[in-house]
From Swiss-Prot:
Biological processes, Gene Ontology terms: DNA-templated transcription
Source species: Haemophilus influenzae (strain ATCC 51907 / DSM 11121 / KW20 / Rd)
Cofactor annotation remark: Binds 1 Mg(2+) ion per subunit.
SMART domains assigned to the protein according to its UniProt record, in alphabetical order: RPOLA_N
Cofactor: Mg(2+); Zn(2+)
Name of the protein: DNA-directed RNA polymerase subunit beta'
Length: 1415
């Protein structure tokens, strides 16, 4: 019993028992304390005896015996001698495995600088000594002397001397001073540093300096020095005097046949170090000439550098085959390094893989497992059963039986497998649905059978895909597999909450076919008493599947008590729909079935079943749908023949008409009326339009057929053409593909993306000629190349996303914040793109939601908005809701359940411990391969569409103008004088229906608050020029408008009108450089006019290229244009689309020419211009004027005297998220990133919930920059985790001190991953060397909070089921302390009292511990 208690004590001290991992610099003493002896010789093993040489790199005396419990000379063998040290060979008798953990060391004859701290930028040694890296290297590699002790001379400490200077100084001062070279000199300098004093000095300098660069430099150095002071690392440890030697079994030497050896590169590197070190020792003993010693020291330094990080400095040392040797640093970094290959990417035992095939008869929770495979995978279980049943006496006998495949073995296998779930995985596992659990059904054959409905989740098809099988061994693993990973528990997609168990292809076609209706089918108009009779009529051939009939349908509706009430009605339907109703579960409405079912409708069916009836019913229903779909797809006999591709008769006339138009344009081009570019664009437009018309004619032709109904009249019905049915049902193919089969192929692109102007007029049914085929090949090949690139890029994006979000877990229920995001429906132009309910469904309300126009609370705050509550919102026409969001969540490390809302894959509020970060990363990364890689070129049709010039309303309602300023002209229309004006149309309930952006100078026929009717045009503007609108009436007075100097006159040849064009500053003669052409408005007497209600003069500066068509002294009225500024035609600007755009957003990259935003609110004016820039001034109501230089070529959005708000756009361009964050705050930047990312995904038709993108944004925002530190631990300008600052501020508040002030900072995902608190996670991501160097110098602690760190140290992750485990661990920590306090006597007493088995002991211990906890 005593042993047992000891054993239990020892057990509790396992790997579980730490919470923090600290990294630091190793001191020489520490390295010696690890070591078991000094390696003195470079020899490895004796080539004859294969025994390790004494004192060599594989020495048994230092590292341990080569054979288990046997010393080298063979004097002591076997277990009884364990722990004895042989007096002959000095080897300890113990297990061989100590050779994996015992280290040795090498005493270096001269100190050597550690290359990581020297060369990894920024150089730590350089920063500490405040010397440039070049100088340090000169000293280290023996090119220059450095003064280490100036004494009474006028040399400085740390001054560099060349050989001559050194000799001169020696002549002058003899031994008053000390100067050295090599690592010793650096070591002396580092030893001599007084860190505390240096810190003080730097702090004072920081107070005094004003220059930003100096400040940054000092802060950097100060941070490093403070890190040294706090971590207890000593600077001189960055120079090594002792080198540790890795245990020999970690750098093995293996004899190959033929007397050669295979060895790890490290042995070569170590050998090199030892050789040079020994030679240096000898030279020092011989007191050799300085120059030789120096050379040897330099070589030693180089060989140690190569051992630690080969190739970082100079040429990499290569082995016999010219490839660089793999150094210690290479062992841990990169995809093949320790972190990613062995710690994060372990391989799994008990697994097999095979090809997959269809199992259409399986249930959703089953899969077919080949018997051969099952026998192999469940081997240990079978052995155990055979023994316990007494069929086999030993394991060996059991093994024989299994190998013979006795009959009894198969019976036992069936027993073992029963209710033992197995995991199936299909690579690439892009989201968590790529691994699911199933119950195996034993089958003959060698292929795994997979249920067709889970194919969508695995993205599997049966064209030769393979899948891997894994067996969960422990009870806990089986439990998890069954309760969490079973395919029946994964009906909804975690990305968007829609069902992912959706039928596709055959099943969809079958259901579509059986729910279609046909005019005048056999048996039309029958009256049937129930669906069973309908089926009978169909089976006996009395009625067709599609005939319209009346059937009595019984629906079941839930009442208040939750029981079903039957409700029977006579319904107009078809035979097929009535038959389908037979598989519908109770509680579903018949209306969902009484329609032609396409893929979307079927998806809705399953969704409704899940929401109304719960998981079990929905799963059974999905299975039934599948069986029925397959059956009726077979019955339909759909097939594709060449005659199904009907070419429309109109095609040829459409094409010839287009050809005529093209010829006409060609003539115009040749007579010089249109430019080459215009011709090209017009030709492409013509062909694109022709293609559309052919496609339309073809679809009309295909999609309908005319039939005679019962009354004998012709009636149109949807066609039963096989190709059309496949596309219409959503089973396979699309209108675009049918267009290529039966319409025309249309325009093709060249490899560079530009469009070839001669289209392919043929389709695939007619066949392509040689030229057409050749043009097609471009696109096809580009598609293949794109796909290959896309996969790699998409995978890398996913990896970065996972890495940045991996430590985000739900850690508490409610953080109590009132913050949130205000959601409004997304409306672009006249249509609602995303309705409000889609945005708020599954979120938690942050504030009470009131009934519009009243104070009545519809939904109290902190309520999860589910489908029913969203219906309430719709019914009350609520148009904006403030919901909780992860971005505004107040939890320190992690997020709270209320801020996250619904778990999309389960449909209820999310559980604690759910790893929402990883789910978000997978949801965004998984569809990555569906996004395009291209950047789109706007050419032809697209560029024409981009120029809108009016707003035509689609809904009747009320006009609202946002940030609008306008003047009323004499036709009493409004002329806008403000930029970025937004115009919205709201309905009677105040819901926004349409949303437009209206430019400056647009003429509006309706004002704010006025009613409009649908179809009315309420705004017009010229898309090609931007007017300068007069805001007062008066007479024009030209200032600085001098012909030939600042302006030129141009006369139009056709009209004879003359106009004045302002010259660009760059084109003017020197005399006109400083003149600023201006139109001033004066009254009849020539006095200045001020703008109404201001003291700003009515004068308008004209930029270059402005066109003035008025003359000096002309009278103008309010709202008339004074001048026109031509808008540069956008030409073909590429839009970055698809995957690269998403990556740019998440990396928070700054665009090439970012928009310029107003830094403060105030009045705009312009100061003196320089050659290429203008000076923009913003004067606020109070405070300093802000000025900024803006290049001339930037088009400005503001005029002199205009009022701007902070964050308004001053000059066009792509907005930078960093600016949005700085000027408009966290919510604005979240909204921006979410919307931009969603735009890309929406374009591809991929649905992702906003939550996931917000999760990533939260991680991008987790750092802050300290702006005011007061007396806290932070430095100003330092980058720290927001959570850290929050914690410190809470303490300061409690102590009554002012809180530390900070600004949030937006980091791209790669930067954010590398800047995480956990150095283990960062090191395993990228730039391993840099991360580890930084962490070691700072003496960082890793709290093991994230998932990745815990996987690396080999524990359960603190998420999911591991979340509870880690919480319990912390509880048990307290208990273990209690057990540890038991004294020896108590233990003895316990031992006397009980004589019990180990199992009982564990049980007793458990009760003991529980009682302790309760106490």
């Amino acid at each position: 019993m005593k042993d047992l208690v000891k054993f239990l004590k020892a057990q509790s001290k396992t790997s579980e028992d730490f919470d923090v991992i600290k990294i630091g610099l190793a001191s020489p003493d520490m390295i010696r304390s690890w070591s078991f002896g000094e390696v003195k010789k470079p020899e490895t093993i004796n080539y004859r005896t294969f025994k390790p040489e004494r004192d060599g790199l594989f020495c048994a005396r230092i590292f341990g015996p080569v054979k288990d419990y046997e010393c080298l000379c063979g004097k002591y063998k076997r277990l009884k001698h364990r722990g004895v040290i042989c007096e002959k060979c000095g080897v300890e008798v113990t297990q061989t495995k100590v050779r994996r953990e015992r280290m040795g060391h090498i005493e270096l004859a001269s100190p050597v600088a550690h290359i990581w701290f020297l060369k990894s930028l920024p150089s730590r040694i350089g920063l500490l000594l405040d010397m440039p890296l070049r100088d340090i290297e000169r000293v280290l590699y023996f090119e220059m002397y450095i003064v280490t002790e100036p004494g009474m001379t006028d040399l400085e400490r740390g001054q560099l001397l060349t050989e001559e200077q050194y000799l001169d100084a020696e002549d002058r001062w003899q031994d008053e001073f000390e100067a050295k070279m090599g690592a010793e000199a650096i070591q002396d300098l580092l030893k001599g540093m007084d860190l505390e004093a240096e810190c003080e000095k730097l702090r004072e300098e920081l107070q005094e300096t004003n220059s930003e660069t100096k400040r940054k430099k000092i802060t950097k150095r100060l941070k490093l020095l403070e890190a040294f002071v706090q971590s207890g690392n000593k600077p001189e440890w960055m120079v090594m005097t002792v080198l540790p030697v890795l245990p020999p079994d970690l750098r093995p030497l293996v004899p190959l046949d033929g007397g050669r050896f295979a060895t790890s590169d490290l042995n070569d590197l170590y050998r090199r170090v030892i050789n040079r070190n020994n030679r240096l020792k000898r030279l020092l003993d011989l007191i050799a000439p300085d120059i030789i010693v120096r050379n040897e020291k330099r070589m030693l330094q180089e060989s140690v550098d190569a051992l630690l990080d080969n190739g970082r400095r100079g040429r990499a040392i290569t082995g016999s085959n010219r490839r660089p040797l793999k150094s210690l640093a290479d062992m841990i970094k990169g995809k093949q390094g320790r972190f990613r290959q062995n710690l994060l990417g372990k391989r799994v035992d008990y697994s097999g893989r095979s090809v997959i095939t269809v199992g259409p008869y399986l249930h959703l929770h089953q899969c077919g497992l080949p018997k051969k495979m099952a026998l192999e995978l469940f081997r240990p279980f079978i052995y155990a059963k055979l023994e316990s049943r007494g069929y086999a006496t030993t394991i060996k006998a059991a093994k024989k039986m299994v190998e013979r495949e006795d009959a009894i073995v198969w019976d036992i296998l069936a027993e073992v497998i029963r209710e033992h779930p197995i995991l199936l995985n299909r690579a690439p596992t892009l989201h968590r649905l790529g691994i699911q659990a199933f119950e195996p059904i034993l089958i003959e054959g060698k292929a795994i059978q997979l249920h067709p409905l889970v194919c969508a989740a695995f993205n599997a098809d049966f064209d030769g895909d393979q899948m891997a099988v894994h067996v969960p061994l422990t009870l806990e693993a089986q439990l998890e597999a069954r309760a969490l990973m079973m395919s029946t528990n994964n009906v909804l997609s975690p990305a968007n909450g829609d069902p992912i168990i959706v039928p596709s292809q055959d099943v969809v076609l079958g259901l579509y076919y059986m729910t279609r209706e046909k005019v005048n089918g056999k048996g039309e108009g029958m009256l049937l008493q129930d669906p069973r009779e309908a089926e009978k009529a169909y089976r006996t051939g009395e009625a067709e599947l599609h005939s319209r009939v009346k059937v009595r349908i019984t629906e079941y509706v839930k009442n208040e008590a939750g029981e079903f009430d039957a409700k029977t009605t006579l319904t107009d339907t078809t035979i097929g729909r009535a038959i389908l109703w037979m598989i519908a579960p109770k509680g579903m409405p018949y209306s969902l079935f009484n329609q032609t079912l396409g893929k979307k409708a079927i998806s809705k069916l399953i969704n409704e079943a899940y929401r109304r009836l719960g998981l079990k019913e929905a799963v059974m229903f999905a299975d039934q749908i599948m069986y029925t779909g397959f059956a009726y797809a077979a019955r339909s006999g759909s097939s594709v023949g060449i005659d199904d591709m009907e070419i429309p008769a109109k095609k040829y006339e459409i094409i010839s008409a287009a050809e005529e138009e093209v010829a006409e344009i060609q003539e115009q081009f040749q007579s010089g009326l249109v430019t080459a570019g215009e011709r090209y664009n017009k030709v492409i437009d013509i062909w694109a339009a022709a293609n559309e018309r052919v496609a339309k004619a073809m679809m009309e032709n295909l999609s309908q057929e005319e039939v005679i109904n019962r009354e004998g009249n012709p009636e149109k019905q949807a066609s039963f053409n096989s190709i059309f049915m496949m596309a219409d049902s959503g089973a396979r193919g699309s209108a675009a593909q049918i267009r290529q089969l039966a319409g025309m192929r249309g325009l093709m692109a060249r490899p560079d993306g530009s469009i070839i102007e001669t289209p392919i007029t043929a389709n695939f049914r007619e066949g392509l000629n040689v030229l057409q085929y050749f043009i097609s090949t471009h696109g096809a090949r580009k598609g293949l190349a794109d796909t290959a690139l896309k996969t790699a890029n998409s995978g890398y994006l996913t990896r970065r996303l996972v890495d940045v979000a991996q430590d985000l877990v739900i850690v508490e229920d409610d953080c109590g914040t009132h913050e949130g995001l205000v959601m409004t429906p997304l409306i672009e132009g006249g249509d609602e793109k995303v309705p409000l309910r889609e945005l708020v469904l599954g979120r938690v309300a942050a504030e009470d939601i009131l009934k519009p126009g009243t104070e009545e609370v519809l939904i109290p705050r902190n309520t999860l908005l589910d489908e029913k509550l969203c219906d309430v919102l719709d019914a009350n026409s609520v148009d904006s809701v403030k919901v909780r969001s992860v971005v505004t969540c107040d939890t320190d490390f992690g997020v709270c359940a209320k801020c996250y809302g619904r778990d999309l894959a389960r449909g209820h509020l999310i559980n604690q411990g759910e790893a929402v970060g990883v789910i978000a990363a997978q949801s965004i990364g998984e569809p990555g391969t569906q996004l395009t890689m291209r950047t789109f070129h706007i050419g032809g049709a697209a560029s024409a569409a981009a120029k809108e010039s009016s707003v035509q309303v689609k809904n009747t309602g009320t006009v609202h103008l946002m940030n609008a300023k306008f003047v009323t002209n004499d036709e009493s229309k409004l002329v806008l004088t403000s930029r970025n004006t937004e115009l919205t149309i709201t309905d009677a309930f105040g819901r926004t229906k349409e949303h437009y952006k209206v430019p400056y100078g647009a003429v509006l026929s309706k004002g704010d608050g006025q009613e409009v009717t649908a179809g009315e045009t309420i705004a017009n503007w010229d898309p090609h020029t931007m007017p300068v609108v007069s805001e007062v009436s008066g007479f024009v007075k030209f200032v600085d408008i001098i012909d030939g100097l600042t302006v030129t006159r141009q006369t139009d040849e056709l009209t004879g009108l003359s106009s004045i064009v302002v010259q660009d500053v760059g084109e003017r003669a020197t005399a006109g450089k400083d003149l600023r052409p201006t139109i001033k408005l004066v009254d009849a007497n020539g006095n200045d006019i001020f703008l109404p209600e201001t003291d700003v003069l009515a004068q308008y500066f004209l930029p270059g290229k402005a066109i003035v068509s008025l003359d000096d002294g002309t009278a103008v009225k309010v709202g008339e244009p004074l001048a026109r500024i031509p808008q540069e035609s956008v030409g073909t600007k590429d839009i970055t689309g698809g995957l690269p755009r998403v990556a740019d957003l998440f990396e928070a990259r700054k665009p090439k020419e970012p928009a310029i935003l107003a830094e403060i609110s105030g009045i705009v004016s312009f100061g003196k211009e320089t050659k290429g820039k203008r000076r923009l001034l913003i004067t606020p109501a109070e405070g300093e004027t802000y000025e900024e230089m803006i290049p001339k070529w930037r088009q400005l959005n503001v005029f002199e005297g205009e009022m701007v708000q902070r964050g308004d756009v001053i000059s066009d361009g792509a907005e930078t998220p960093h600016d949005i964050l700085r000027l408009r705050g966290v919510r604005a930047v979240t909204e921006y990133i979410v919307n931009e990312v969603q735009d890309v995904y929406r374009l591809q038709g991929v649905k992702i919930n906003d939550k996931h993108i917000e999760v990533i944004v939260r991680q991008m925002l987790r750092k802050a920059v300290i702006t005011k530190a007061y007396d806290s631990e932070f430095l100003e300008g330092e980058q720290v985790e927001v959570a850290r600052v929050k914690i410190v501020n809470r303490q300061r508040e409690a102590e009554g001190k002012p809180p530390v002030e900070f600004e949030r900072e937006l980091l791209g995902i790669t930067k954010a991953s590398l800047a995480t608190e956990s150095f283990i996670s960062a090191a395993s991501f990228q730039e391993t060397t840099r991360v580890l160097t930084e962490a070691a110098v700072a003496g960082k602690r890793d709290e093991l909070r994230g998932l990745k760190e815990n996987v690396i140290v080999g524990r359960l992750i603190p998420a999911g089921t591991g979340f509870a485990y880690h919480q319990n661990r912390h509880k048990h920590r307290l208990v273990d302390d209690v057990v540890a306090k038991l004294s020896e006597e108590d233990e003895a007493a316990i031992a006397d009292e009980f004589v019990i088995t180990a199992d009982d002991a564990t049980q007793n211990l458990a009760t003991l511990l529980n009682s302790e906890i309760e106490d």
